[in-house]
């Protein structure tokens, strides 16, 4: 099974604008790595595609801010469906295992649209 943590965050500055809070939290270390600036440089150098909505926020502002990071997503376009999911790569990662985990993560999305 794949497990993720859920973390509730409450700002010290209760009156801070929601966009400032999201900006301070993005990208999360779980997505980008840490320290953030060097990690983002590596991602920009290695990844040859636009992440689109993947790893961005989906937020609702209804008297408060409710946001989630889009980890498993799909986007429709005229050319087809793009599925997004990822995993943490470390020095001990086994490439085939990482690939299989990613396939497992998007299997529910594929099933939802009957994609084979």
Where are these regions (language model features)?
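Contiguous alpha-helical scaffold segments within structured protein domains
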Residues: 1-44, 114
């Amino acid at each position: 099974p794949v497990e993720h943590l859920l973390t509730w965050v409450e700002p010290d500055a209760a009156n801070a604008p929601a966009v400032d809070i999201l900006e301070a939290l993005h990208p999360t270390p779980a997505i980008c790595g840490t320290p953030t600036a060097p990690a983002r440089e590596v991602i920009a150098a290695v990844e040859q595609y636009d992440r689109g909505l993947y790893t961005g926020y989906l937020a609702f502002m209804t008297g408060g801010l409710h946001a989630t990071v889009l980890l498993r997503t799909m986007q429709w376009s005229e050319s087809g469906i793009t599925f997004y999911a990822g995993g943490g790569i470390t020095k001990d990662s086994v490439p085939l295992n990482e690939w299989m985990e990613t396939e497992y993560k998007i299997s529910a999305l594929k099933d939802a649209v009957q994609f084979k």
